[in-house]
């Protein structure tokens, strides 16, 4: 239970933690039978718990595999040479997959992980991080379907550690259209802002109030978002800005504005953003001054791009 607190947990006490086991038993009480088996340790080579866990898993309709990092493995002055989970956890997940039952992988960790070996073994992944004393309760709600998840990743998950640094707002490279690696993709496993829901959303094309605007001007952008699924849900609408040409090399893209909307099944909403050129398109130059250079800027929402021209 202590490991759910993570680093810098302040006044959090182990005795106050609602564990995953406690929360799941309460959530499914009278609705489903829940068996709990401690299958493997965080690290080491002890596989003695595998047999009992596999036996229970074969009788289950769904397997929930809770894996991850110890609470002290991340935080201040706590680095790891490899961001894969230890081999004993990998082997345990492989054995669970062999049962043929659906596997929900629940991760509790304090950093992005390398999941290239684990992801193919999971039918679903819930990233709960190290959520503190009440973290078990919302997790149980997501597992039961009482809660429709709407979170988005605030960090990028690489395919392998060799891709690091791979943060979303990294600088443009000289040959960014050709990629970086000869032996693998340049794309991450899960990018910044990724996150699934029990419903689905469809974005319309962003619409600008003007195609051109002055360096000290204002403009707005509207985008429609439709809930195309069968259940109500919330969607975080993220607005990115990209400046392909500037005196200083600019990031590939930067998150500059966002909102979150609750959208009923079948409903379409319009998200409106009032933007300020200096505030939302500007950057700090090598003299510490906030500047906006004239030229082309891309506004990206829901993976769709519209181009704005900033004039002198």
Give the positions of each predicted feature.
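Glycine/threonine-rich flexible loop motifs
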Residues: 2-6, 67-87
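Terminal connector regions
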Residues: 277-312
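Short acidic, flexible loop segments centered on an aromatic residue
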Residues: 230-247, 253-255
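Intrinsically disordered, low-complexity Pro/Gly/Ser/Thr-rich segments with frequent PxxP/GP/PP motifs
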Residues: 247-285
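A short helix->loop->beta-strand "cap" motif at the edges of active sites that frequently abuts
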Residues: 31-32, 99-103, 122-123
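An anion/phosphate-binding loop that grips the pyrophosphate of nucleotide cofactors and donors
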Residues: 60
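Secreted, periplasmic, or luminal enzymes acting at the cell surface/secretory milieu
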Residues: 1-8, 12-21, 25-28, 108-234, ...
